[in-house]
């Protein structure tokens, strides 16, 4: 499975199309990590799955009357992906609360936004974070802010997990 990972478009819907155009093949889904949900309207009539979470600047949703969740846990084959914007877990001050929340969900990948800073870090099984002990390795990723031309890609297959960064 291949995913385009976007966050923090902040009104730059045009950059969503540009990031999609750079992909070698159509992703299985767009994972949107908040702050610009209304920008996803550019994908409304395209045949592409969109999985959004709400950010601190998302006062309106993609579809009237619906609200995007603050967290989404995706199960893809043997993998679990936890998506969040991160503002409710204080990610600008550190990742401890977000990783502890993830440890409870037992996810393999934690995707977040909010800081606008690209990040990729592997945490080992057995690490203690905010009182939680990770039961398995965890890949923590932030694609950076799409408004700054940054995005991510996530590939999951039977050989493992690969996260990459892209720029416009």
Predicted segments with their positions:
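Active-site neighborhood of phospho(di)ester-bond hydrolases with catalytic His/Asp-centered motifs
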Residues: 5-7, 29-35, 51-56, 82-85, ...
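Binuclear metal-dependent phosphoesterase catalytic core
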Residues: 17-18, 76-77, 100, 105, ...
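Helix-adjacent hinge/juxtasegments
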Residues: 49-92
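Pre-active-site segment of Zn-dependent metallo-hydrolases
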Residues: 15-22, 83, 88-102
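Conserved beta-strand segments of alpha/beta enzyme cores
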Residues: 2, 49-51, 80, 139, ...
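Active-site environment of divalent metal-dependent phosphoester hydrolases
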Residues: 10-15, 37-41, 57-62, 88-94, ...
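Short secondary-structure boundary/capping segments
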Residues: 42, 64-66, 71-74, 101-102, ...
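N-terminal active-site segment of His-dependent metallophosphoesterases
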Residues: 1-50, 65-69, 158-159
């Amino acid at each position: 499975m291949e995913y385009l990972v976007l966050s923090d478009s902040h009104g730059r819907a045009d950059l969503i199309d540009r990031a999609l155009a750079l992909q070698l093949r159509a992703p299985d889904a767009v994972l949107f990590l908040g702050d610009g949900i209304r920008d996803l309207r550019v994908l409304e009539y395209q045949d592409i799955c969109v999985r959004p979470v709400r950010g601190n600047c998302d006062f309106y949703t993609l579809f009237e009357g619906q609200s995007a969740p603050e967290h989404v846990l995706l199960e893809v084959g043997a993998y679990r992906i936890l998506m969040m914007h991160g503002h409710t877990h204080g990610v600008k001050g550190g990742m401890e609360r977000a990783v502890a929340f993830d440890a409870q969900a037992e996810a393999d990948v934690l995707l977040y936004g909010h800081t606008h800073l690209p990040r990729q870090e592997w945490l080992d099984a057995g690490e203690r974070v905010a009182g939680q002990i990770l039961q398995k390795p965890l890949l923590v990723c932030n694609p950076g802010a799409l408004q700054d031309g940054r995005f991510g890609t996530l590939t999951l297959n039977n050989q493992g997990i690969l996260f990459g960064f892209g720029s416009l």
